[in-house]
Regions:
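PLP-dependent amino-acid enzyme catalytic core
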Residues: 1-207
Length: 207
């Protein structure tokens, strides 16, 4: 199958039954292969949603400069989406972000700015807001942007419901910005209020 643009390949990822799970449970456990998205993660969905919806509302236009604080997959996805849609983008991250992620972002044409490890993501977000106040770019603000969970309410959630035939009892998701778990759970709970939602994060996580 051929697609005219890369954004049309985002989403509709496959569900795969996990066969080798610990314990003796007979429950069916499915994993959704979000790594099959073109930039390699579930973050492709909100990245496109935030840019496309802001553009549709007339808040930004191709050629504008976008700014975002991110040290992970959202940055890679935003760099891809910005390149495809004709935006410049500056990504701000702590200096201890992985070299592999930095390389992926720059490969898509993003400009990177580092803050110190001690400043962390809070410092990166502060700098992004300062740049916006100085007219140096438009902050997408993945942490507070409703277009983040909207991507999962309109896409990921309906896909899961469709591909399970509605036969889902639990949804389990990691939590970062919480866009995935908020959007998917909102949709699934509308279909069946009895579905259980389980959020996971590292014991020492800051989310």
């Amino acid at each position: 199958m051929q697609y005219p643009t890369i954004d049309q390949t985002v989403g509709n990822t496959r569900l795969v039954r996990l066969q080798r799970m610990p314990g003796n449970s007979s429950n069916t456990i499915l994993g959704k292969l979000e790594g099959d998205n073109p930039a390699g993660s579930v973050k492709d969905r909100p990245a496109l949603s935030m840019i496309q919806n802001a553009q549709a509302r007339g808040e930004i236009k191709p050629g504008d400069h976008l700014v975002e604080a991110t040290s992970g997959n959202t940055g890679i996805a935003l760099a891809m989406a910005a390149a495809m849609m004709g935006y410049q983008i500056t990504l701000i991250m702590p200096a201890n972000a992985t070299a592999e992620r930095k390389a992926a972002m720059t490969a898509y044409g993003a400009t990177l700015i580092e803050v110190t490890k001690e400043q962390g993501m809070e410092g990166a977000r502060d700098l992004a807001m300062q740049m916006q106040a100085q007219g140096k770019g438009r902050v997408l603000d993945q942490f507070n942007n409703p277009d983040n969970p909207l991507a999962h309410y309109q896409g990921t959630g309906p896909e899961i419901w469709r591909d399970t035939g509605g036969a889902i009892t639990h949804f389990v998701s990691s939590m970062g910005t919480t866009g995935t778990i908020m959007g998917v759970s909102a949709y699934l709970k509308q279909q069946n209020p009895d579905i259980q939602i389980i959020g996971l994060q590292p014991e020492d996580g800051a989310s």
